[in-house]
């Protein structure tokens, strides 16, 4: 269990458990890490909430919102923002699933990808600014938790879109029900302990977003990819931060 959590932590963030060394992981080990995506999200939630709480009376809210957005992007190696950009480029520039997947493999960022990143960052900064000014910091703990759960929900029983291997293939082809249930349990406990009302709203919002996103990915790409899962994380984070800004 500890090693699976370490896999999730090192895959989703810059962090690494002490006394661990890089090694080649089996597809099953990668899939096992899905269970702990929400727990890694909780760690990232502290990276949202703690600076916001400690520095809110010292640093102007807008400047603090920009700094927190930059911090979380760096801590996650901008992995999910990259997925969002790739998906936007593929959908915006391709005319069929094969062409879209081909565009998504290109390491260069196009106009649609740049626009998607700019909009995601702008929405995050605006929402964080509103939440910081309202002094409601607990919802910030849950936003990355639920967004990482959304990736697990979307991956479960989703076909892999590419014929050849890719970063998301080991996750998508080996995820099992127990991984989903563990992730759901960790998210539910976190929501109950941190902020039950917002947690329930966040889960409902994610539950509505994931099926729609899966349907679109089937239509656009013929299935799911690692880039698409990263894009979903960014979309859900934007929606949840915006919801927190409106609720509080």
Curated annotation (Swiss-Prot):
Q: Which cysteines are joined by disulfide bonds?
A: none
A single BP term in Gene Ontology: cobalamin biosynthetic process
Cofactor(s) this protein requires = Mg(2+)
Bilayer topology term:
Multi-pass membrane protein
Recorded E.C. number(s)? 2.7.8.26
Keyword entries, A-Z: Cell inner membrane, Cell membrane, Cobalamin biosynthesis, Magnesium, Membrane, Transferase, Transmembrane, Transmembrane helix
| Domain of life from the UniProt record | Bacteria
Its GO CC terms are: plasma membrane
GO MF: adenosylcobinamide-GDP ribazoletransferase activity; cobalamin 5'-phosphate synthase activity
Q: Where is this gene product found?
A: Cell inner membrane
**What's a Pfam family in this record?**
CobS
PANTHER family reported for this sequence: ADENOSYLCOBINAMIDE-GDP RIBAZOLETRANSFERASE (PTHR34148:SF1)
Q: What is this protein called?
A: Adenosylcobinamide-GDP ribazoletransferase
The species this protein belongs to is: Syntrophobacter fumaroxidans (strain DSM 10017 / MPOB)
């Amino acid at each position: 269990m500890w090693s699976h959590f370490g896999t999730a932590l090192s895959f989703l963030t810059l962090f690494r458990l002490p006394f661990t060394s890089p090694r080649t992981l089996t597809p099953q080990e990668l899939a096992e890490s899905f269970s702990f995506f929400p727990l890694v999200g909780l760690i990232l939630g502290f990276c949202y909430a703690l600076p916001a709480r400690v520095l809110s009376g010292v640093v102007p809210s807008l400047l603090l919102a920009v700094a927190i957005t930059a911090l979380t992007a760096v801590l996650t190696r901008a992995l999910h923002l990259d997925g969002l950009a790739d998906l936007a480029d593929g959908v915006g520039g391709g005319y069929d699933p094969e062409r879209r997947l081909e565009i998504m493999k290109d390491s260069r960022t196009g106009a649609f990808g740049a626009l998607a990143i700019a909009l995601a960052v702008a929405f995050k900064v605006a929402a964080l600014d509103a939440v910081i000014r309202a002094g409601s910091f607990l919802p910030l703990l849950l936003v990355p938790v639920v967004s990482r759960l959304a990736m697990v929900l979307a991956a479960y029983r989703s076909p892999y879109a590419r014929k050849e291997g890719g970063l998301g293939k080991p996750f998508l082809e080996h995820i099992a029900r127990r991984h989903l249930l563990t992730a759901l349990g960790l998210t539910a406990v976190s929501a109950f302990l941190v902020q039950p009302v917002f947690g329930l709203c966040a889960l409902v919002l994610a539950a509505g977003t994931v099926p729609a996103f899966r349907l679109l990915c089937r239509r656009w790409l013929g299935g799911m990819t690692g880039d698409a899962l990263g894009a979903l994380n960014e979309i859900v984070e934007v929606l949840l931060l915006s919801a927190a800004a409106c609720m509080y």
